[in-house]
Amino acid sequence: MSAAAVERPNEDRPLIAEANRIMDRLPGYRVEIIGGQIIVSPPPDGPHAEALTDLMLPFAASGLHGTESKVLQGVGLWLPTGTEDYAIPDLVVVDADYRDHYVENNCYDPICFRLVLEVTSSNYRTDLRDKVKAYAAAKIPVYVIIDRKHQRLHVLTSPTGDDYESHRPHSPGEVVTLPKSIGAEVTLDVAEILKAGQPQNG
């Protein structure tokens, strides 16, 4: 049983109010609250966006963006790790009725998330450490990380406490099939994804 979502005024949410002020001052930046800390990420570069588009295609082709589930970018995920914690993953697979699970501040209850995916940027440590704990605590079944710095694709499954029981890094040359629990069979070519996301120099 879940209570109806109640929109709280920002005066009662000082961190959220500050995060929203930062977003107003820095259009295009991603602002999240993880572990009670405000995390500010610069706008993604072109290769980051290219990798994300290349990732969208196999998810959509598998039928995941349909009547049972949706494949979305930039959707807020309400986190249980703090009273104002939320994240904005790069890509998510959610139940089709995700709108019924709205919490507040453009964020949704983690119960409707089947998968979250992050393509790393300059603050890659957040994706590889802080968000592992946060997404595990939220019981997100599958967390995929495209680690552009170290040229790896990580698949984390079976959340327990603030960690995942299974954490498998994959290298270029491998082809990875994601767990069918997300609702369909999705296969990713590690080399192709990492090549598309290769950071620009300079």
Model regions and ranges:
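Gly/Pro/Ser/Thr-rich low-complexity, intrinsically disordered segments predominantly at protein N-termini
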Residues: 1-138, 142-202
